[in-house]
Regions:
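Catalytic cores of the polymerase beta-like nucleotidyltransferase superfamily
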Residues: 1-301
Length: 301
């Protein structure tokens, strides 16, 4: 019986009826898309951050759907939709200003094609299990089928969330080399979800920090801003300094000057407070906080 259970888990993943997902936290738009896909005989699940946030009793803001339908099939099914992306084609399904991102199950490509920005090009489609394998962290690889209310967790993401552990899927060094921005994502999720990063991953991150130099500035800017706009900016700064990233991006974060530290902490606290109160946050204000010391010193000269 044990061998049979293990075989089933490897084939279909671990199915959970508990913990239960509060359907009321899922947007009606996302639910409608899944229903339409399933009615047309495609597999479809909500995956990623939305499910992770619901499991820790937070209200998700964004919903991603993974499906067996190809981008072209999705596009034909939803009139208000558009195909986007070069590295991997996605479909944005629109409902007014609301956008739901729908992606086709991915498989690992037989041969890697590295683009100019240092990231793998990846348009190989696959199965649900293969799609789970391609995701970065176990906490982002939990699938939910709202039709039968079941969670599918191939890599123990639910347990990792419960145990407050950030775990990468696959061999960490390979995964960080595939896309170095995962280093920043690891820090963001650790800060946002209060997860610990084990010593092995910490060591690998330190070894591969320089890979971030190959990423376009525009993409780095987006990821760094996300890191400080999760509502946990102070925690992010602690981790930023732990991995010596402040020196690369915002040296002021390493300042030992008491007045500079107080100014930075107040700016970060105010940003976190606005996010927790669901108020708008202008990234320009945060940048001004980071750059104020240097600008002020230049003015005084």
């Amino acid at each position: 019986h044990t061998n049979l259970i293990e075989s089933l888990k490897n084939t279909v993943g671990t199915l959970f009826i508990k913990p239960k997902i509060d359907i009321s936290k899922i947007s009606k738009h996302a639910l409608g898309i899944i229903l339409s896909l399933q009615k047309n005989k495609y597999e479809a699940y909500i995956v990623g951050g939305a499910i992770r946030d619901i499991l820790i009793n937070q209200n998700p803001k964004d919903f991603d759907i993974a499906t067996s339908a190809t981008p072209e099939q999705i596009r034909r099914l939803f009139k208000k939709s558009r195909i986007i992306g070069r590295r991997f084609k996605l479909v944005h399904v629109l409902d007014g200003r609301d956008i739901i991102e729908v992606s086709t199950f991915r498989a690992k490509p037989q041969e890697r094609e590295i683009m100019a920005n240092g990231v793998e090009r990846d348009n190989a489609y696959g199965t649900l299990k293969e799609d789970a394998e391609r995701r970065d962290f176990t906490s982002n690889s939990i699938y939910f089928n709202p039709t039968n209310k079941k969670l599918i967790d191939f890599y123990g993401g639910i347990d990792d969330i419960k145990n407050k552990q950030l775990t990468i899927i696959g061999i960490p060094e390979i995964r960080f080399r595939e896309d170095p921005v995962r280093i920043l994502r690891a820090i963001r999720f650790a800060a946002k979800l209060d997860l610990s990063i084990n010593s092995d991953i910490t060591s690998i991150i330190h070894k591969n920090i320089n890979l971030l130099e190959n990423i376009p500035y525009s993409r780095l800017f987006d990821e760094v801003m996300k890191l400080f706009l999760t509502g946990h900016a102070l925690k992010s700064v602690i981790l930023f300094n732990k991995f010596n990233l402040s020196k690369k991006f915002f040296p002021v974060l390493q300042s030992t000057n008491p007045s500079t530290q107080a100014f930075l902490k107040q700016g970060l606290r105010d940003t976190d407070k606005r996010i927790h109160e669901s108020k708008a946050v202008n990234p320009g204000i945060l940048l001004a906080v980071f750059l104020w010391r240097d600008v002020n010193e230049a003015w005084e000269k």
